Amino acid sequence: MIFNTRRTFHHRFLRLVLLAATAAMATDHVAAQAPTPLPAEVEALLARAKVPRGAVAAIVVDASPGGRVQATPLLSYQAANFVNPASVMKLVTTYAGLELLGPAYTWNTPVYIDGPIKDGVLQGNLIIQGKGDPKLVMERLWLLLRRVQALGIRSISGDILLDRSAFAASTQNPGDFDGEPYRPYNVAPDALLLNYKSVVMTFVPNPGSGQASIAFEPPLANVQMQASVPMATNPAGTPLGECGDWRALLKPEFADPFRIGFSGSYPVACGEKVWSIAYADPASYSERAVLGLWQEIGGKLGGRVREGRAPASLKPVFEAASPTLTEVIRDINKYSNNVMAQQLFMTLSMSPIATARLGAAATAPASLEASREVVRNWWRQRFGDADLPVLDNGSGLSRNERVTPRGLARMLQTAYVSGTMPELMGSLPIIGIDGTLKNSRSRVSQGWAHLKTGTLRDSTAMAGYVHSANGRRLVVVAIVNHLNAPAARPALEALVDWAVKEGGK
């Protein structure tokens, strides 16, 4: 819902304060309880994964018993421990976003011109001002530039200025987290984030020519992109008729920002494949993408594409609106999009709508530290100081972020009885159906749980809502922190299966 009046917000805030007070009492009760034994099937799968039970922290509790936060869980195992939730941290960011911004919130990208238009020529500069839109993908950038042309502009005598000043400049090196700089999940937030700073390559075999053609999206100006690659029937080390590790067989060469190429071959058995990579020079990506697309649609530019600020005296000729926050959090949670989560996280300190609801002022430019403080203040106002999350970038792509399963369960219970419950639950993967849980092997809980997943090299996690056949709904939070954590995913799915069965009793 959107809160249009001060009175509506105060009523809503009072209700949440009461929920927080109830939750605080629940916390004390849960903390005093002895740990509940883990189900036998979960224990067996943990042993198979060589993960000790001490590496597990979990809680299963009713989502809304009588519309109140429940004090007595069905299962509580080390639920007060602070653990790394991996991408399950996105639940905190997206629920905070729904509460502070509202489900219908949109990001606007203003476009300015600073000169007259004569005979199809803009005699001045075009300015595109980024305001943190998490989903300014190529299709929407194309529409934005077509709107520029609809103003009668076919040529620009000056420059195209890209204003990225709404966010503090990132000092993040794409390879810092795990040494994988070309993985799109490592892209840093940007006020003018275009197409996730990624290049999408589509490989299409043409057996007649012995080549696989390569289509690149977007067209990056002044970057050579290899048009085709030789095909191989049986690459070395690959069984006949199998695709194998086709990415490695291509022998990619991504380090040069002026060239994307391959020195290997493409297996015939692979058919058509798509590969997305993060561009080697993220600082120049936006300039290259805008120029490449402007030229592709027939636009001419007398100057160049460069960074610059929109003059304060100018008014935009139009603003390009993003999809709603409801749509954005579906991408964040169902597909665990890290950079979109970080864009939302940064927005929370930049938006006057969000900060005003906490009695604070917006920060310019937005920064990670300012956003951490916004989310901490939001948590304190909703839930008190208990189980206060340790925040980094809000996406879970971090070695430092921490939550307690107990605190996360309380948040999910509160969300369940809130006006934004449909939007939050609808953003979560449905086990065995879609998103990051589409390929779940669970047969008991398939279609019966909405869960956010998280995986790092030493953490695996699930959290969300489980539904039983008799209509009972449970909150499940389960997190494993261990070097073998990824192998413990079946154990977490077994806990979800157990919750489905227990909920039906």
Identify the function of each model-found stretch.
Residues 2-17:
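Bacterial N-terminal signal peptides that target proteins for export
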